[in-house]
Amino acid sequence: MVAVLNLVCGSFNLHSQTPNFGANVLIFDSSMSMASIQSQLNTVFSQQQNNQFGTQRYALFFKPGQYSNLAINMGYYMQVLGLGQSPDNVKINGSLDCHAFLPNGNATCNFWVSSENLAVSSTNGYTMWAVSQGTSFRRMHVQNNLYLCEWSGSQNWASGGFLADSKIDGSVNPIGQQQWLSRNNSYVGWSGGNWNFVFLGDSSPPPQTWPGPYPSYTVITNMPLIREKPFLYIDSNTNFFVMVPNLRTNSVGTSWAGGPTPGVSVPVSQFYIAQPGVDNAGTINAALNSGLNLILTPGIYHLTNSILVTNPDTIVLGLGFPTLIPTNRNPAMVISDVDGVKVSGIIFDAGTTASPSLLEVGTATNAVDHSADPICLYDLCSRVGGQFIGTTTNCVTINANNVVGDNLWLWRADHGNSGTVGWTINPSQSGLVVNGNNVTIYGLFNEHHEQYQTLWNGNWGRVYFYQSELPYDAPTQSAWSHNSVNGYASYKVASGVTSHQAYGLGVYGVFNTSNVKCFNTIETPTSSQQVNVHDMINVLITAQTGSEMTHIINGTGATLGSAVTTATANNLWLNPTFALSAGLDGSGTNFAITLPTESWHSYRLQYKNAVTDPSWSNLGGLVGGNDTLETITDPTSASSRFYRIVAY
């Protein structure tokens, strides 16, 4: 009784409406002096602007109201949050910008910044959000134009990015952005961009243009399934709550277009508020076991044991990029195989001794169905090396079924503090291993690991937008090969998988230390009838002489051997070519394939009588486009006939 009471009192001041979020959460009110607010913003930014591998983290809260003539500049590990029930409850008049941290407009290292749940009206007519991986822009109302990259400079590059549940009153201009995922947004127009842009459930997206010429757009009409990220807000009595939005299916546009986002409000008194330097796995697990949810305040948490999330519907909310570091060969966090857990806003940083995984979701593969209340992961980053020497086997392992990921960056560092990066210094095998079924990820960024970046063993997996760089630093081809195959595919769907769908995949090569080759950047089963891969691109950015990206998928796609070159593939096939055995066809029965279709594609069966025929012939008309199982038949099939299924 005393222990539980101490936990509750430690996490929430019962005599105050404002919880104790710690020294690194700054809470602003519109009644405060704007000059005082600006001074505090400037102090934080000046510290964080060049603090890529520092230990300081900040969350900046704005209570409902109007804030005039503020210039909010974003630096590393800074999160800006509005505390209204709607983004329009907090309005910033002035600017909220993230400019390129490197010289000459180079934003390719603009990591770990976030802005959520407020409106901004910029005095210069646009909001600049020049960012790369590990960033988020959610529940925002930009009352001007939105730029996703610096528009001036000799190297105006950026490697983003993620925009969700937001309204842009003007247009979105990516400028020099390499790739982006836009989901459940509205805007007047979208123009420009480069290699791989995916639009998912936007209310007025640009037309499909894949494979370009640039920009290359993949457009999917409806968002299949999402529960928007939980968010903090205060009511009219300044009491703090966390809103847990309702689950949406086949959605288009923002969750707040018709008013406050529907959902369930949870008082912050039902959360344990952890503090860096005070709390550890023991105190946090005691709170979770007592039935409390968890808020992690900004800072670094060293964990000799795993944080164990065992209760259904637990909310774990990270503020200001809290960073979990396992120190005893343990995962930083293990989520039990229970319904409805929601984890957001955390960096999982590998310790100096290898963990099996930094985040483990579900402890073993099983048949437990979470489809009515899925486990959800939002805005999560993993990092191996960079700040200090780190190592892990995998970054994230998903064993549970029906998990939804929304904006994940799994990074083996390619640069960092001196002595923290190298093939044998910060090793990790894979960024993501999926063993569960019906796992869906929107926005998967996965880079530089030493074997498969992504290894997918479960069935009915779905990925919408994939960005991956192969490892920069493989010392030799023999060090980066397996079974006499050069390199490892970035995106590997295991041979036993019978159903998988992926849309908008970009894999990039930066081979700047040795002349190595990667035979396939994407590998999928070639005998399955329900494996879909749509809109793929390889880009060889930098290459030592003799390096190459040999193929895109399964031995097909142009070979790239010099920088900067690209190769694309835009057909969706359930398998590139498959043949029926004579025994199956010999009876003269109809050949039939049953496949799951989706509302944004139509499908057609094509055939060749010999694999060497120069072209494919159509069989019948288009089917599908209705989110149901469809059967496609060939009533005249012959024993030598080869088939493929193409999507439009």
Model regions and ranges:
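Bacterial N-terminal signal peptides
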Residues: 1-10
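Low-complexity, Pro/Thr/Ser/Gly/Ala-rich linker/spacer regions in secreted
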Residues: 12-19, 572-587
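Right-handed parallel beta-helix/beta-solenoid
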Residues: 16-39, 249-280
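N-terminal extracellular ligand-recognition/capping segment immediately after the signal peptide
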Residues: 30-79, 85-88, 95-97, 276-282, ...
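Right-handed parallel beta-helix
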Residues: 67-79, 84-206, 342, 347-440, ...
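Gly/Ser/Thr/Ala-enriched C-terminal appendages of enzymes
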Residues: 176, 192-238, 351, 466, ...
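Long amphipathic alpha-helical scaffold regions
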Residues: 305-338, 342, 460-501
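Short, composition-biased motifs enriched in small/polar/acidic residues
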Residues: 577-648
